[in-house]
Amino acid sequence: MGGLSIWHWLIVLLIVALVFGTKKLRNIGNDLGSAVKGFKDGMKEGETPADAQQLPRSGAVDVNAKETTRSDSNKA
């Protein structure tokens, strides 16, 4: 008597389906599945090494080009 049997769970499921309706429960299931998928994709994206990620080239400074310009101006 202390535990819940399968019949208790079926009655609870039936009451929940009557209260919320099957369409609402289906939407909740779809939203939950999308959230889990998004979380897994985010975790996979976070596991990629930092040096493997492509950094944007805009605003990047080429250090070697600056050094060669300095050495060329000293020769003149």
Curated annotation (Swiss-Prot):
One Gene Ontology molecular-function label: protein transmembrane transporter activity
Region (Disordered): 40-76
Subcellular location field: Cell inner membrane
Listed Basic and acidic residues bias regions: 64-76
Membrane topology: Single-pass membrane protein
Transmembrane segments: 1-21
Alphabetized UniProt keyword annotations: Cell inner membrane, Cell membrane, Membrane, Protein transport, Translocation, Transmembrane, Transmembrane helix, Transport
GO CC annotation, single: TAT protein transport complex
One Gene Ontology biological process: protein transport by the Tat complex
InterPro entries, per the entry: TatA/B/E, TatA/E
Main location class: membrane
UniProt family annotation: Belongs to the TatA/E family.
Function: Part of the twin-arginine translocation (Tat) system that transports large folded proteins containing a characteristic twin-arginine motif in their signal peptide across membranes. TatA could form the protein-conducting channel of the Tat system.
HAMAP family, per database record: TatA_E
Subunit organization: The Tat system comprises two distinct complexes: a TatABC complex, containing multiple copies of TatA, TatB and TatC subunits, and a separate TatA complex, containing only TatA subunits. Substrates initially bind to the TatABC complex, which probably triggers association of the separate TatA complex to form the active translocon.
Record protein name field: Sec-independent protein translocase protein TatA
Organism: Burkholderia cenocepacia (strain HI2424)
Gene transcribed to yield this protein: tatA
